[in-house]
Amino acid sequence: RRYERDIRKGKRFEILAMENSFHGRTLATVTATGQEKFKKGFDPLVPGFRHVPFDDRDALLKAVGDETCAILVEPIQGEGGVICPGDDYLPFLRSLCDERELLLVFDEVQVGIGRTGTLFAYEPFGVAPDIMTLAKGLAGGIPIGATVATERVAAAFTPGSHASTFGGNPLAAAAGLAALEVILEEGVLENCRRSGLHLRQGLERVALRHPDRVREVRGRGLIQAMDLTGPGTPVVETCMSEGLLINCTAETVLRFLPPLIVTTEEVDEMLEILDRALSSTCQGAG
């Protein structure tokens, strides 16, 4: 919005976000999130956000109006169930934003920094955002977040125009640089691709052994999901009892995000535990 006013000299303010999305826990990011369960108790929310179905070109074209200034999207909807759009969706968004003079904002907090096998999840699609948010793997466990932008968009933030208490602190910045150096120079991205493929193939084999329990396996790199025919919590609890930490999102979706340095041997161990958990929790599933 500041870019719209200070750089573009316009008055547009509306941000289009996606249904089923998740963007955070501040008032603005709760508003941007496309899941009602995260909004309860926080009314009144921030005005100027509207939601459209994810990976739906027609719905988005109809939604863009005279007050729209930006489109906010996760390249993969993580909290929403590891929902991957079609390969042409992100290029479509880039083309639409260029045509309508909108800013394209990618939330890569969960899928960025190597998670999908490339440094950023958008890279295989030949497009780039105007603004991107990053966190989680950015500093190897040290709390850090970053909002990065093109030079033209970043010009809207002049010194002192916006800040955060710990923004740019030396500890987090040093940790971020160290983590990026390891990721880029010590084969971490290659391992993400190798172990990610191994994980995907293994999950598909497990799914074939449990056709009554598994609807679908989906994901990219080291963010994978198994959509079950029934509640996922019993499987999560059984896996935990055997030392495997996974989680369940969207009630039926098991989500797998192992460390970026996970080995194929560790993936095999995980798959064995998962296989046993699906077998032992089959009674009453569905």
Language-model-detected regions and their locations in the chain:
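Conserved N-terminal phosphate-binding loop of PLP-dependent enzymes in the Aspartate aminotransferase
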Residues: R1-G286
